[in-house]
C-alpha cells in the first residue's frame, strides 16, 4: 500500500455529504455490474470506510483511492496496510490531477456535494 497524508478522528462530516455502503452483498452486486477486470487501474472517489475499496482491490490490478476526510483516511491507512495494490491519497478529488499516462476506470459512491 502507498499512502499520502493525514489521520482519523471518527465523526461523519455531513458538510461533505458522507454516506457509506456497508453491505457486502450490495457492494458485490455493484462491482459485478461494472466491466472492471484484473488488468484495470481504478480510481475510487471517496472511499470512506473502505468497504468498496476492498472489493475493488480484489477485482482490479490497482486502486488509487482519494479520500478528503483526514479521519477516514487515517482508518484507511490502517485497514489497507497489508494490501499491495492500493494507493491512498488524502486530498479533495476536485483538486487532484487525473493521470495522463495510463488508462483507468473510475468508481465512486459519489458524495452528494460533488453532484
Predicted segments — roles?
Residues 1-115:
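Catalytic cores of RNA-modifying enzymes
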Amino acid at each position: 500500500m502507498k499512502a499520502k497524508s493525514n489521520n482519523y478522528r471518527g465523526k461523519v462530516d455531513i458538510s461533505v455529504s458522507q454516506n457509506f455502503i456497508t453491505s457486502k452483498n450490495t457492494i458485490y452486486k455493484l462491482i459485478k455490474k461494472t466491466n472492471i477486470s484484473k488488468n484495470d487501474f481504478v480510481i475510487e472517489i471517496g472511499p470512506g470506510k473502505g468497504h468498496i475499496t476492498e472489493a475493488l482491490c480484489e477485482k482490479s490490478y490497482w486502486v488509487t483511492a482519494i479520500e478528503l476526510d483526514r479521519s477516514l483516511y487515517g482508518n484507511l491507512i490502517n485497514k489497507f496496510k497489508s494490501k499491495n495494490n492500493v494507493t491512498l491519497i488524502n486530498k479533495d478529488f476536485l483538486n487532484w490531477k487525473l493521470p495522463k499516462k495510463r488508462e483507468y476506470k473510475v468508481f465512486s459512491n459519489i458524495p452528494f456535494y460533488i453532484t
